[in-house]
Design a protein with these regions (language model features):
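Domain-wide signal for the mature, well-folded portions of proteins, strongly enriched
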Residues: 24-25, 39, 46-47, 58-60, ...
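FAD/FMN-dependent oxidoreductases across multiple families
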Residues: 59-142
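C-terminal helical "tail/cap" subdomain of flavin- and related membrane-associated enzymes
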Residues: 73-74, 132-205
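A generic structural micro-feature
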Residues: 7-9, 96, 177
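Conserved FAD-binding catalytic core of PHBH/FMO-like flavoproteins
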Residues: 1-84
Length: 205
């Protein structure tokens, strides 16, 4: 069954791998002229990171990762890492999240740049809504289906433009753009209440 979608490519490739590091169970993200690097805690033994490297450069991905490892003093063990060929990053959002007796949720309804890590949160929000109204949805109640589409699609549209804005800002993290980013991050660190509100908004999706 076909669903109408909006979609575009980000002009970046993503690479995923696991490396050994002492991460203290803290997720981190770094921004550079190459793109973004996310380090996500993987094991409970505090010895592994899951790496997501999103790059807009055509140069060797492992060489870029080694450069970032030195630039940010990450102390990652990259000796045996295998990044493979990567995959193209693409935005896809279903314009309507139901058709006939089929309801879309999670990655079936939208796919975002992993920069902000919000794809999972949005998918969980979809599932929570479906769980709350499962009986009416199973009956294909039109009002419930339309409310689901309106409520969740609004969240998806909001996140689309938030991520596009972040991508535009951090995708030009050099010169004046770099100074603005660093200034903004320092401002947030000085005012925890604003940072907490941003985190609260992200988690509500």
């Amino acid at each position: 069954m076909h669903f109408d979608t909006e979609e575009w490519f980000y002009g970046q490739k993503a690479y995923v791998a696991v490396v050994k590091a002492n991460h203290e169970n803290i997720a981190k993200q770094y921004f550079s002229k190459f793109g973004t690097l996310a380090l996500l805690p993987f094991n409970q033994d505090l010895q592994h990171y899951s790496i997501i490297l999103c790059t807009n450069s055509t140069s060797d991905a492992k060489a870029q990762l080694e450069s970032l490892n030195q630039e940010f003093n990450l102390s990652l063990d990259l000796k045996d890492i295998e990044l493979g060929s990567g995959f193209e990053l693409k935005h896809v959002r279903a314009k309507k999240m139901f058709k006939d007796r089929i309801v879309l949720c999670g990655d079936a309804a939208n796919s975002f740049h992993p920069m902000a890590g919000q794809g999972l949160n949005l998918g969980i929000g979809d599932v929570m809504y479906i769980d709350s109204y499962i009986n009416k949805l199973m009956e294909s109640d039109l009002d419930t289906l339309m409310n689901y589409n309106s409520t969740r699609n609004q969240k998806n549209i909001q996140m689309t433009w938030i991520i596009q804005s972040l991508y535009g800002i951090f995708g030009n993290a050099e010169g004046l753009g770099e100074k603005i980013i660093k200034g903004g991050m320092k401002f947030l660190d000085r005012i925890p209440s604003i940072k907490e509100k941003i985190i609260e908004f992200a988690n509500k999706n």
